């Protein structure tokens, strides 16, 4: 996770406080976890029932590095667990890796990778369960995207538009026409897209910064995505507060 993404992620905590949904592991996740960590026990069903929904028991088990080794030992193991479980384990591994480093590589707005001595800041961030859970859930949401066609009536005329929940412009347009009470969820999705693209594909986004942009161009730079993500996280939280 590039440290500059911290400017976007700083608004996640507020959002997660408002929309704190139960992010639970499913039965297959728990079985894989128990089989991997509790190797000296045979009463796996009992342990699964014991640790279910118990964060204080699950947390140390999720820290076991053996989970990473076993997950990638066989491809079949990757489909045994949910994307949310997989990304939770991966984020914990990233945190362990960063504990041994003084810097992380940051992609600047020209596409150049430079060392930034903020590894500790990222480590501390991933040490906060509420942030880590949000990131795991957000990353999992991009393993399967949705698209479709929507029809709506505006100013006496019917309109038709195809939408994808991986496209910022689509989500902005959809937020404009849906009921106000549904907008915070779409604002969150817009912010998630910005965070995902700027954090996972910064090299791709910075290509746009080096190109000449006409005043009609809809291309966004890395900086644009960062600013947009931060703004929509903030708006989502504010509008949700007002609707309460």
Annotated model-derived regions:
Residues 2-244:
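Polar/charged low-complexity regulatory segments
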């Amino acid at each position: 996770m590039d440290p500059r993404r911290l400017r976007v992620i700083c608004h996640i905590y507020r959002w997660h406080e408002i929309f704190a949904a139960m992010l639970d592991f499913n039965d297959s996740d728990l079985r894989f976890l128990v089989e991997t960590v509790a190797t000296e026990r045979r009463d796996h069903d009992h342990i699964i029932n014991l640790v279910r929904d118990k964060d204080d028991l699950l947390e140390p088990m999720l820290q076991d590095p053996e989970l990473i080794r076993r997950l990638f030992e066989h491809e079949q193991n990757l489909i045994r667990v949910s994307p949310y479980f997989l990304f939770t384990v991966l984020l914990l591994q990233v945190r362990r890796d960063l504990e041994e480093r003084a810097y992380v590589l940051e992609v600047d707005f020209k596409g150049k990778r430079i060392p930034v001595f903020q590894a500790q800041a990222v480590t501390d961030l991933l040490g906060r369960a509420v942030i880590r859970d949000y990131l795991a859930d957000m990353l999992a949401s991009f393993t399967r995207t949705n698209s479709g066609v929507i029809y709506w009536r505006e100013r006496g005329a019917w309109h038709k538009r195809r939408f994808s929940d991986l496209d910022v412009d689509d989500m902005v347009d959809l937020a404009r026409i849906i009921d106000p009470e549904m907008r915070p969820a779409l604002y969150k999705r817009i912010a998630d897209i910005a965070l995902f693209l700027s954090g996972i594909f910064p090299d791709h986004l910075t290509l746009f910064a080096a190109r000449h942009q006409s005043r009609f161009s809809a291309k966004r730079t890395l900086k644009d995505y960062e600013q947009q993500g931060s703004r929509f996280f903030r708006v989502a939280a504010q509008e949700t507060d007002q609707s309460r």
